[in-house]
Structure formats: C-alpha cells, structure tokens
Amino acid sequence: MEIREHKSSFAVYVVLRVLVIAVAVLEFFNGDYEAVFLCILTLLLLLAPAFVQVRFRIELPSALEVIVLVFVFAAEILGEISSFYEIFPFWDTVLHTMNGFLAAAIGFSLVDLLNRSDRVKFELSPLYLAIVSFCFSMTIGVVWEFFEFSMDMMFGFDMQKDAVVHSISSVMLDPAHANHAVHINDITQVAVNGRDLGLGGYLDIGLIDTMEDLIVNFIGAVVFSVIGFIYVRNRGKGLSVISRFVPRRKSHDRDYLRLW
C-alpha cells in the first residue's frame, strides 16, 4: 500500500539511494573515508521520511517527501562531497531557504496533529498555528547557526563561510574611544602579518553568511506558515495544491508495511 500510494517519492528515493551508494564506492576506492562515512549518514537520512510515516503513523504527502529527499541529497552529496557550496555560491542560500520551509512544515504538522487529536485537549487558531510554525522554523535555524559557530570555535572548521567585503564600519577604530563608528570604504587589499591575502577586499569571517542564512530561513518559514494558515482556515475546501505539502495522520485501519 505504501509504495503504491507514493510511487513518485519511492522512485526518487531509489534513484538517490543508488547514486549515494555509487558515490560511496567511488570514494572508498579513492581513499576518502570521511566521504564514505558521509554517504552512510546520507543513506540513513534518506530513510527518515519512511521512518516517520511508519513509526508515528503520519502521512507525508509525496511532494513534501520528495523535497525532503532532494534536500538531504543536495546538502550532503552535492554540497559537501561534490563541493557545490564552492562551485555555486547560491547553493547554501537555496538549501537554507528549503530548510526554513521544511522546518516550518515539521513545526506546523506537530501542532496541527495535536490540534486534531481526540486524546489531547489542545487547540490553536489558524493564526497562532502559523505563528508557532514560523517560530519553530526560526528556532531550528538559530540552533543550527549556534552549531556552526561552535564547530568553528572549538574545532577550527569553517562552517560559517567567509565573505569578501569592500567597506567596514567599527567603533574599535575610533581613536577617541567615543563609541563612534569609523568607516573605511573602497578596500581592495588586506595584509595579515605583513602578507597580502590576495582577496581584493576585507575578509568577513562568517557574519554575512550567518545573517544571509537566517534571512532566507525566515523567507522559507514565512512561505510555509502562510500556506499552513490558509490550509487550516479553509480545511476541506478544495485546496488540493496546499494539501500536497501538509502532513496528516494516517487512518488506524491501514497496514503500514503492505506493498500492494
């Protein structure tokens, strides 16, 4: 039953799984065992949607499930192993936008399922449901930035990507120490310990990347929160497009492991 009802998402799952296994084999022979470990982690993450559906009896629409699968593949295999983060400057931005959308979908689903449960005395209006969905997504985004910052500080990673800027403003440059920002414009060269970095500008160490990530996470969260608000307020009134992105509880009489 599950595969028959989710033909498109199952096909995507199979294709992505085959690609990940192929990459894992290739990286194994190349001696890149860190990439092999990342492939194994990706294979486990690709199982997450199916695990949620079977374990918690939640019906994930095929469209949402495909987005989750593609997101995992794009982030881990394309982004990390294939270096798409470096090849395509917008790659990180696109993924953080998707993350905001997906996190909002998760937050919305959790509360909406409680709203509709007969065993829980809990009910929120469509507006508050959308607000909770938005706040959940933004919290996930902020916690992720905390994680990136911690990895950079404790282990010397560069998860908060750097950016080259050509102007800065800082009160630390104020010779009078009067808390007045001093502006430096048209920066084309920066030297560290007497050595030119050759960047053509000033190196910003993560602030711009962090703020861009949170801004696009905000956009993704707003988009799904609006979708969720419209869906709940007009539930059952022909909103078939929106329903493709909103999880719902499975019926109790269904065999969750049947293939036909």
Describe each PLM feature range:
Residues 98-115, 153-159, 219-233:
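Membrane-interfacial alpha-helical segments at the cytosolic side of multi-pass membrane proteins
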